[in-house]
Regions:
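Acidic helix/loop microenvironments that form the catalytic cleft of cell-wall polysaccharide enzymes
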Residues: 88-92, 176-200
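C-terminal helix/juxtamembrane-tail motif
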Residues: 202-218
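Peptidoglycan-targeting cell-wall enzymes and recognition modules
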Residues: 24-65, 70, 79-173
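Fungal secretory targeting signals
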Residues: 1-24, 217-218
Length: 218
């Protein structure tokens, strides 16, 4: 609650100078999007949330927003969906966190734990949020309070669960998408390289769960 209160108290910092205008992969169809049981299989701790965990979302709560993001960013194949959900579940600790808790980097968060500069770019890509950040060219030199306020704009569920798909499509681009569609193992390595991390054993556990959930482990 303190975090939310801080966000709302800082929103004037953001709006003061804005205007009033507010392959080989198996395909999936929009009628066969990931379901709650599949997402629980990938993120097993998402079965429930503690009342004192405001960031936390269960798989049941997350599923419609994840499905919406796949449709919005036109992610149609299971290889890419599996890689995306493996990353989301790992980074958010099974959807328990949407801002960086340790070491607590200001402005870092969403389901894929984007850094502050990407959260600003993501906010600018969303028509409802763009006017609120239109006057902010970059995160360089911004106070921690402002960085966290920008993060707060993109952490409501409808935006939080879309950030990973946005990053994959807009920041990693066609080469990584095609690599995932051709070969999940090789493509996942390319995806993690784009994110700026290694394919650790911990990340591989989530990928293997995703492969099993979507029948890609045979």
């Amino acid at each position: 609650m303190l975090y939310n209160c801080l966000l709302f108290s800082l929103l004037p910092l953001l709006v003061s100078s804005t205007t009033a205008n507010t392959t080989n992969s198996t395909n999936i169809t929009f009628n066969n999007l990931p379901n709650t049981l599949q997402i629980q299989q990938i993120a097993p701790k998402s079965l429930s949330c503690l009342p004192c965990s405001p960031d936390c979302r269960t798989a049941h709560q997350a599923t419609p927003f994840i499905a919406s993001s796949l449709k919005k960013y036109k992610i149609h194949d299971l290889n890419t969906t599996a890689a995306l959900l493996a990353l989301m579940a790992f980074e958010s600790v099974d959807f328990r966190y949407k801002h960086n808790v340790f070491p607590g980097r200001p402005g870092q968060g969403t389901v894929n734990m984007q850094s502050a500069n990407f959260n600003l770019l993501y906010a600018k890509s969303i028509p409802a949020l763009k006017p609120l950040v239109a006057s902010i060219p970059s995160v360089e030199g911004l106070k921690n309070e402002t960085l966290n306020a920008i993060l707060g704009l993109v952490t409501p569920d409808e935006y939080n669960f879309g950030s990973a798909a946005w990053f994959l499509v807009k920041e990693c681009g066609r080469d990584v998408l095609r690599a995932l569609q051709r070969d999940l193992e090789g493509g996942f390595g390319a995806y993690m390289k784009c994110v700026g991390v290694e394919v650790s054993e911990e990340r591989r556990v989530y990928l293997e769960r995703a492969k099993k959930a979507f029948g890609l482990d045979s």
